[in-house]
Amino acid sequence: VGCEECPAHCKGKNAKPTCDDGVCNCNV
């Protein structure tokens, strides 16, 4: 998942989306 889609991808997962080296991470 790319950075631009990260917030939507992580939404509803109680996550704080971060982006490292172009990679989306949903950090709980």
UniProtKB/Swiss-Prot annotation:
Has the structural arrangement of an alpha-helix connected to a beta-sheet by disulfide bonds (CSalpha/beta). This is Potassium channel toxin alpha-KTx 9.6. The keyword Secreted applies. Its main location: secreted. It is found in: Secreted. Expressed by the venom gland. It comes from the Eukaryota.
